[in-house]
């Protein structure tokens, strides 16, 4: 099969840094830091602040605004209510801020979707958005973005990123739908008669602060006291914090936007986003991605949704079949139901269907390892792609020496649990140049696309960098039909 490696390589760049909160290990240490800065003469404050601002020129946008926010977050530690000069406020804020090189270690596991803006392009050219897993200090992962174009001949051009990266702001007082939130509580076993008064005090939609207030009020009258009510209330608030909204600067370049861990469930990383352009039955278009939330001990599949790549809603997935990692949504409903591929057992690919996007209760086995290059395990490489021949699904297989390769299968268009074609050999296996990296002998993708009769595959090389390959779609489909299931 005529697979063309483009030679394009996206490598991690340790000069791309964002600012983020720095929190000392204890409130006592934070108090001492604030106290030390408060003792400085005003002239020394001015000198130190000038030094900070001079040391980081051109590295960040709106840094002084963030210093101000950081001061407000520790202002309660001040020992008096006396006035604090603007410069001293900013200097205190700088002591509670740090830089983070979000892609200093790796830039990998890409997924590709077609950009909502296709204007201003030559004929036969399409613009895409590439999501990437960026890994930095402490092996914390986030999701970054790039844009690019592919022409009718398969030529790919990536837009260079700007020199800035800015974490989004969490939307204040984002609303929760009471019905959906209640169902998630039920799934987690967090609802009993003792919680009812708090929920009844909430309207059909509510904010986090309203939820916390209702829980606080109910807790004061809880018969079991704080020892019983405290952990239950904390678990309910944790669920709310795992379902949140963020907003990026709409005037920023897409390469400046990042999905950085915020909730407790993802404190150690947002991993392997599999974006898909999802078309609802009414024709409306949404961009959705499953991702893996990691808190240092537990991995959980979660969902991110956006219409414009400016405002994002991140939410939990629920149900007995939500487990492990590597889930991928189909790009539309099938027979009126959402469909998603999964790998709960860590070895085989399953198909799930549900009438509700956030709840998954059943699965059926669809694909087992069958060829030597995938005897260890198989999984998906992103959402299935709809073709006239069926659903084209890229897979990854793990073989000898834990080598990861990319393969393909064809699923029935009306019954995607039925396999109608399967490659016996991989589409892509790591070459000598690709096998060297953080995790050797790996090629991997989180989502490809089809343009002008070509399958465009972004793929990572050994968990370190990212490249692209293209292959005629007809060649892939012909091989799938020839190899059968």
In which residue ranges do the predicted regions lie?
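Beta-rich, blade/repeat-based domains predominating
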Residues: 328-332, 381-383, 445-450
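Donor nucleotide-activated moiety binding/catalytic core segment of transferases
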Residues: 373-381, 441-444
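Beta-rich carbohydrate-recognition and catalytic domains
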Residues: 1-268, 277-327, 332-376, 386-438, ...
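A conserved acidic, glycine/proline-rich C-terminal tail/linker
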Residues: 434-448
